[in-house]
Amino acid sequence: MLTLYKFALEPIAELSGDPGSYGFRHDRSAEKAALRLMDECAHDDEFVWVLKADIHSCFDSIAHKWLLSHIPMDKQMLSRFLSCGYIDKNRKYPLRRGIPQGGSLSSLLCNMTLDGLEDYLHEVCGEN
């Protein structure tokens, strides 16, 4: 069922997604990111800033409240996905924050959460 929601959300995420974001996106890869970077640098006589980011505990830090208010999908289904938790040694642990890594929606929800970061960095740091 969640995979169907993923298929429904993917076109929305692609339209609203940051153009410079290459992680967990259809038809994007590290190789394509490197090619775009080389192309950007080849046509510019000025210095170009490059940001490679690894957001520490990104999946574990995403607030459920934010997701429920910003992700355009059935709120009850999203809430169930977010609260499913995990099982370790026959004991269930609920999630109060973050999204389950490896879930069919997880990488898409992470990307949708980070959308806007590229524009914010351009605004704060300048266009280049």
Placement of each model-derived feature along the sequence:
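Active/ligand-binding-proximal structured segments within catalytic/core domains
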Residues: 1-9, 110
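Conserved polymerase palm-domain catalytic core
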Residues: 19-20, 35-128
